[in-house]
Amino acid sequence: MIIVKNHKFKLDLLQNEANKEKFEGNTACSTAAYTLVREDASTGLTYTADISKVGNQISGEPAQRIKIREHRRIPKFDLPNLKVSKVYKLPLEASYAKGLLLLLIFCFGLSGCNTSKRLPYSHKYSYKELSKDDPHNLTYKGHYKVGKNYKIKGKTYKPHNPKSFTETGYASWYGGLKDGFHGKKTANGDRFNRNLLTAAHKTLPLPCLVKVTNKANNKAVILMVNDRGPFKKNRIIDVSQRAAEILAFKNQGITKVKIEYLPNETEKFLKNINLKKPQSKTLAKNSKKSSSNKVTNNNKCSVNCHIKLINLKYKLAVTP
């Protein structure tokens, strides 16, 4: 364990194809590589930096023999997956300790600059906890579709797959005990569950991801659009009961929101739930051949779990 001004680090052996030597006591080959892990409790983030050791002895050698090669950020809850062989104490000379700390702060500062809006996943939840509302929903039940033009109450709607899309208007929610929607099929063959992070929209592709922000309180959540609606005047989106609770407008029933379509996150999400898009626009208009018969890429993480992970990536709440 390296301690520099209250910052704690773990030393972890990395595999080296050319030289697969392991720790023995406090010695290691000069070609061995290690991982430096920094935990920042104030932000809940964890960083790693690959460092190389020049010399044989870890303990008792001047600290200058350790140098940083590269760094990256990792989800804190992935730390148990790191193969930690042993933990060591490294003596740090006062002058070098200060330099190492400044270098680490500089490296980690650069790492954070480009990702200030997209923070790594939270460490507070396990896959089991994130999947508690649909633990057996490991195979997506619906299919991908954009859909044909349709008419409701004399108004024609034209579903499409935009490159970018934002919309501001009023949101309502559905899935209450008396409205009868819970458990019914959605427009793309999925099964509606009032406890999941889903929504209905008139024209966006199904399924896709949107960020919904409550203009009244700035609370936001990312939802999977898997149904059509709402068709009441001035309503632009219907969200599930759980989403309404997170956005804090369940009691009043409606609120003004901003919708942002997330095409890049949608593409990643479709891959994670093993749902392929139809090859042609014609098939996308009304496709049931795009249904997934494979479990999600992480068989411990349900479909709703994958939606929650994206929320955590953007540091958004997944519970009311």
From Swiss-Prot:
Class of this enzyme: lyase
What CDD domains does the annotation carry? Answer: DPBB_RlpA-like
Q: List every stretch annotated REP05 insert 2.
A: 89-98
Q: What is its EC number?
A: 4.2.2.-
Q: Enumerate the InterPro entries for this protein.
A: RlpA (IPR034718), RlpA-like_DPBB (IPR009009), RlpA-like_sf (IPR036908), RPE1 (IPR005728), RPE5 (IPR022438), RplA (IPR012997)
Instruction: Show the segment(s) annotated as REP05 insert 1.
Output: 12-59
Q: Where is the signal peptide?
A: none
GO molecular function per UniProt: lytic endotransglycosylase activity
Q: Which UniProt keywords apply?
A: Cell wall biogenesis/degradation, Lyase
Q: Name one GO biological process term.
A: cell wall organization
Region feature (REP07 insert): 62-74
Q: PANTHER family from the xrefs?
A: ENDOLYTIC PEPTIDOGLYCAN TRANSGLYCOSYLASE RLPA (PTHR34183:SF1)
Main function: Lytic transglycosylase with a strong preference for naked glycan strands that lack stem peptides.
Which family is annotated? Belongs to the RlpA family.
This protein is called: Endolytic peptidoglycan transglycosylase RlpA
